[in-house]
C-alpha cells in the first residue's frame, strides 16, 4: 500500500527515517535466493497503471544503507544455514510509493523457501550487525559525505555490474535502471523518444533526495 511511512507517522506521532521491507521474492527460475533492491516504476508513463503498486513515473528515495546491507549479505553468502541460496541485488522495480528512503530485503523464490528458517536467521544477523555497528559508533554510510553515490543504467534484472561495484566499501549505491526500464522509440522524423529520459531524471532526483547535501 502506498504512503505507509506517512500513515505510520500520523498514527503514532513518530517520524520515519528509513523503511526496510522484509518480503517474499518471486522468480520464474524458482532459485533459492536472498535479494536487495530499491523500488519505483520511473519508466512508466502517466497513462500506465503500475501492476505492483507505486506511482507511474516515480521512484521513492533508495535506502542510503543499501550498499552496506549488500556487503553484509555477501559476507554470509556461504553460510551453512543457506547452502543452496544465491545472493544478489536487483534493479529498481515495483511499488509501493512513499517519500521516505527505503529498500526491499527479500527471500525467494517459491513457497518452499519463503519460510526457510536459515534464510530468516541470516537476514536477522545481517540487520543486527549493521544496526549494532551503528549503535556502537561505527559511522553510518548516511553520514559519510566523502563517498560517491552511484546510479547504474542498463544491464539485466539482477544487476551484475551493480553487484560488483556495491561490494566495494568506497561507494554508495542509489537507483539501478535495467535496460527494460530505459524505453526508447524512434519517430518518423528520426527523433528518439520514449520514457528513458524521464526515467533517468527521476532516479537522479530520487537518489539525491536520499542523500541531501551531496
Sequence positions of predicted segments:
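N-terminal catalytic or cofactor-binding beta/alpha core of small enzyme domains
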Residues: 1-99, 110-111, 117-121, 128-162, ...
